[in-house]
């Protein structure tokens, strides 16, 4: 109403209202807008996200041979985003149901939670379901945020140990929740493999009852996973020290193509009565990156304790985002609960996993056999999943970007999904050039 009245005023009359216009009881000082607000003057400029920064640099590069090996999203052999046919089919079938857009419960769609946790825990599920608390989350990061806030509120220890190195956002999520973040040894640069002795030593040295974050499969960023025997040793150390296991499983099925194999650690811990919680994501194995479908689950001692944990989880989620989005969870639930679609999806996951394995083999073969590079590249095929820790140093990474228009993180991590039959030789030749000097 005021806006309409002001537009009807003569310009000279409007000009006289410089400092005393009142709108809905709030005095508007026109002269103050000229001075600007000083309340945010001390907010420092934050550093750009390293992964999204790589993507921006890639987009600005006009070279036809440019490569983006930083982003953790799957690409097909043509370098294009890949929407799984099973996901397309699920969307079509869901659309025909004309579902509403009402709020989901605070902990999400119940059937999705059941299907997600069954996928994760497998044969162990039936023995733990009565004391398992679950909540649909905003993908894996959302599950980690629920976990971080719950542990900060209710777990005695306020220190969490993460692998060195770990996913870049882990430290941010847990420190923002008020937890102290420390690290344990994980990657051995000399062997480009797992430093199991250092890891077990650090877990033993940590105070009893510490929170230990473990990558369930396809370790990010190294691609280095423990063997089953090493997982057994890790479990024994965790039990001896009464540590709390926080398992981050973002790549089930996507790592090896085998859902059970990728969930080995999760099921081992769940069946061994170790205090634990699990964070799941369907971003990678269903390609639901923008749909943000995930699941948080935590094991209680009994059903009564589970009820109390669930009540606090609901309060926590209500404060964070109230209710999770429904579309991604509906897609995932539809696939998981439909035998034919589930079988189709499983085959597509195997296909994605096999393509990544083939790119690892091709890269190694070109470097070692075709180019006769003086270094060993065995670690490329020893590692697993979407990422590979190449061993390239920051200086070599800079040369790759400036001279070859190839973009990856400073620590030498590459996303294998960025490689395809058209560009893998170019990348190998670039690596050969920067490592031969």
From Swiss-Prot:
Listed cofactors: pyridoxal 5'-phosphate
Protein family membership: Belongs to the class-I pyridoxal-phosphate-dependent aminotransferase family.
Pfam families hit by this protein: Aminotran_1_2 (PF00155)
Record-level Gene Ontology MF annotations: L-aspartate:2-oxoglutarate aminotransferase activity; pyridoxal phosphate binding
UniProt keyword annotations, A-Z: Aminotransferase, Mitochondrion, Pyridoxal phosphate, Transferase, Transit peptide
Additional remark text: In eukaryotes there are cytoplasmic, mitochondrial and chloroplastic isozymes.
Top-tier EC class: transferase
Role: Plays a key role in amino acid metabolism. Important for metabolite exchange between mitochondria and cytosol.
Database matches in SUPFAM superfamilies: PLP-dependent transferases
Listed PANTHER family: ASPARTATE AMINOTRANSFERASE (PTHR11879), ASPARTATE AMINOTRANSFERASE, MITOCHONDRIAL (PTHR11879:SF22)
This enzyme's EC code(s): 2.6.1.1
InterPro entries listed in its UniProt record: Aminotransferase_I/II_large, Asp_trans, NHTrfase_class1_PyrdxlP-BS, PyrdxlP-dep_Trfase, PyrdxlP-dep_Trfase_major, PyrdxlP-dep_Trfase_small
Compartmental location: Mitochondrion matrix
Residues modified to N6-(pyridoxal phosphate)lysine: 284
CDD domains reported for this sequence: AAT_like
Assembly mode: Homodimer.
Main location: mitochondrion
Gene3D superfamilies found in the cross-reference section: Aspartate Aminotransferase, domain 1 (3.90.1150.10), Type I PLP-dependent aspartate aminotransferase-like (Major domain) (3.40.640.10)
Protein residues bound to L-aspartate: 72, 167, 220, 413
GO BP, sorted A to Z: 2-oxoglutarate metabolic process; asparagine biosynthetic process from oxaloacetate; aspartate biosynthetic process; aspartate catabolic process; aspartate metabolic process; glutamate metabolic process
Superkingdom, natural source: Eukaryota
Catalytically driven reaction(s): L-aspartate + 2-oxoglutarate = oxaloacetate + L-glutamate
Name this polypeptide is given: Aspartate aminotransferase, mitochondrial
Gene Ontology cellular component list: mitochondrial matrix; mitochondrion
Transmembrane annotation, as ranges: none
